[in-house]
Amino acid sequence: MTDLVVRRLLIDLETPFAARWNGGDAFRSAFFSALSMSFPVGEQFFIDSVREGLKKLPAEQQAQMAAEVKGFIGQEATHRRIHELFNKHLSNMGFDNRFAARAIERIQKQAHLNVRMHLAVTAATEHFTAVFADWMLHHPEALAGAEPRL
């Protein structure tokens, strides 16, 4: 299997950005900003699910999967950190992230479910993200005129 490369993305998120950062378009900016607000909670769920899933494997399989899991966790932690920085600016502009608290509450209510269910949700969500990313690559107009550093 191909090794996961954890990219330490260096994006300037110290400098504020405009609320309509996506080409001045209110809808496109709000759409992608709302997505960003949902990501940190989801990424932490993915990390927790994969970490718990690894623990459930027999010792031999744990050893085989450890590096891959470490790479996945590193990648997700990097994404979470970047979205948290982005979301901090959104909050400073007055955007209220009500999704995160509700998502955390739902995740806690489902904590009793089998780790396989959590891994299935993780895999399905990652697949959706990959399909969405592919769509984005084929439709650059979705980010036309966006703040270049974002």
Which residues fall in each region the model found?
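Non-heme di-metal
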Residues: 1-150
